[in-house]
């Protein structure tokens, strides 16, 4: 019989909290949950409150809530007024002075949702890091989720920080996001930006890879059962592999002439393509925030201005962008009192 003599290690307050947050329960909390759950709850609650009750009349001159007759596609929590600059619009700040109604009217809910939403997304990423460490796996899920975080932060925070105010960020709504896309095209020629092209290639390429991968796995499932249905060809708890990598490799070698040689390279490529697309899009948006130009083919514009018979798809798109700027600016920024004389409004070369 062995008797161990020693002093029991004292447990401080940190150890007690650490035990509680990491306790095995239906929904794991963890240290990241202390950031994730409150911020996500407040961001979602603020968005539901804003789309239900809060008008955008004082910031954009628009109706934007269910209470005013909007539906799910047209409601939004709009950005603050241009005059607010880059103020955090705290409820107790000098703009609202503790008045909740005034705070909603000047766009305080948008700042509330944007900041809490950003921290909520970061908390979700940290949650994946934390659980991966506890379970003992690699943190590639968290690395992959950095892509959506980069896009959200660049679009909703970095872009308006590079512009005059939060006013130029997207409002939180479906139709509002569409309006923001038109704005980016008209004022930044976004679709011709190489970072946008890389982003589209990454996202659509990732979707294609997912479709091909899922179909290939379904095609090569082992037919161990009696039924013809591939979903009954294996038991979910079996330890053996359920599909043939060799058969899949042979199939795609015949289709393309090349195929992935192992699963590690295949799945890393499926991770790399969409995440790289998201990150390049985020870099492009930061460039737009700084008003950097890309792919301006001035020589074609000059020739089109001199020769009425010369026109390319690029020059036609430039005219469309001018139209977006001319018609959107007056509607989107009524506080500027834009008045465009007839001679500056865009028109085709043939007119």
Curated annotation (Swiss-Prot):
Q: Which PROSITE patterns match?
A: REACTION_CENTER
Q: Where does a plastoquinone bind?
A: 213, 260
The principal localisation class reads plastid
Q: Where does chlorophyll a PD2 bind?
A: 196
The similarity comment for this entry is:
Belongs to the reaction center PufL/M/PsbA/D family.
What is the additional note?
A: 2 of the reaction center chlorophylls (ChlD1 and ChlD2) are entirely coordinated by water.
Would you tell me the protein name for this molecule? Photosystem II D2 protein
Q: Which organism is it from?
A: Gracilaria tenuistipitata var. liui
Q: Which gene encodes it?
A: psbD
């Amino acid at each position: 019989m062995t008797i161990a003599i020693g002093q029991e290690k004292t447990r401080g307050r940190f150890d007690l909290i650490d035990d509680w947050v990491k306790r095995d329960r239906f929904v794991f909390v963890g240290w990241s949950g202390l950031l994730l759950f409150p911020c996500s709850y407040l961001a979602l609650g603020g968005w539901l409150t804003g789309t239900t009750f809060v008008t955008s009349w004082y910031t954009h001159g628009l109706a934007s809530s269910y209470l005013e007759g909007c539906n799910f596609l047209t409601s939004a929590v709009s950005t603050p007024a241009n005059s607010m600059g880059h103020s955090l619009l705290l409820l107790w700040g000098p703009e609202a002075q503790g008045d909740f109604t005034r705070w909603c009217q000047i766009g305080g809910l948008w700042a509330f949702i944007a900041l809490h939403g950003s921290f909520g997304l970061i908390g979700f990423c940290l949650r994946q890091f934390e659980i991966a460490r506890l379970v003992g796996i690699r943190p590639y899920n968290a690395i992959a989720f950095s892509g959506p975080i980069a896009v959200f932060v660049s679009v909703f925070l970095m872009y308006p920080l590079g512009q005059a105010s939060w006013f130029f960020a997207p409002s939180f709504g479906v139709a509002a996001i569409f309006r923001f896309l038109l704005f980016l095209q008209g004022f930044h020629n976004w679709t011709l930006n190489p970072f946008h092209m890389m982003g589209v290639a990454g996202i659509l390429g990732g979707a294609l890879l997912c479709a091909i991968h899922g179909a290939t796995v379904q095609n090569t499932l082992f037919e161990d059962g009696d039924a013809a249905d591939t979903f009954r060809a294996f038991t979910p708890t079996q330890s053996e592999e359920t599909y043939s990598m060799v058969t899949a490799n042979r199939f795609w070698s015949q289709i393309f002439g090349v195929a992935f040689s192992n699963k590690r390279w295949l799945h890393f490529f499926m991770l790399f393509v969409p995440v790289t697309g998201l990150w390049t899009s985020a870099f492009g948006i930061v460039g737009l925030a700084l008003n950097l130009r890309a792919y301006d083919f001035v020589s074609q514009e000059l020739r089109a201005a001199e020769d009425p018979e010369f026109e390319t798809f690029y020059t036609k798109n430039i005219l469309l962008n001018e139209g977006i700027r001319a018609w959107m600016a007056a509607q989107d920024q009524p506080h500027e009192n834009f008045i465009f004389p007839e001679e500056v409004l865009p028109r085709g070369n043939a007119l």
